[in-house]
Amino acid sequence: MVLSANDKTNVKNVFTKIGGHAEEYGAETLERMFTTYPPTKTYFPHFDLHHGSAQIKAHGKKVVGALIEAVNHIDDIAGALSKLSDLHAQKLRVDPVNFKLLGQCFLVVVAIHHPSVLTPEVHASLDKFLCAVGNVLTAKYR
């Protein structure tokens, strides 16, 4: 998925609003994913999955931190997320469809917290970006 210059600008603008809320938005994204798609919980048998859980907050912060890293290296997402791709493909063996589900939940969280920012054009750019991240994270499964 190729991001245009306009897509990159849109994504960077959205993430200027998200950066300071990594833990909050990440936890909310994970909680939405676990509630909406219960099979995704199977990858977290050791987590307390209740609302407000310290483990959910910490992992949510890591998830959004990885997205921020991808934004900071938007011209080389594969390089920026290479180690994370290895981890998910070789050690954790996460079903690749879960990255799409997580991306959908993240879009909902952005829409809830920043409705005026998520215009149709920005929504499309952010979706393309999240698909690009998902593609990078699943590339080493092949």
UniProtKB/Swiss-Prot annotation:
Involved in oxygen transport from the lung to the various peripheral tissues. Keywords: Heme, Iron, Metal-binding, Oxygen transport, Transport. Heme b binds at residue 88. This is Hemoglobin subunit alpha-A. Residues 2-142 form the Globin domain. It comes from the Eukaryota. GO terms for cellular component: blood microparticle; haptoglobin-hemoglobin complex; hemoglobin complex. GO terms for biological process: hydrogen peroxide catabolic process. Heterotetramer of two alpha chains and two beta chains. InterPro entries: Globin, Globin-like_sf, Globin/Proto, Hemoglobin_a-typ, Hemoglobin_oxygen_transport, Hemoglobin_pi. Red blood cells. Belongs to the globin family. Coiled coil: none annotated. One of its GO terms (molecular function) is haptoglobin binding. O2 binds at residue 59.
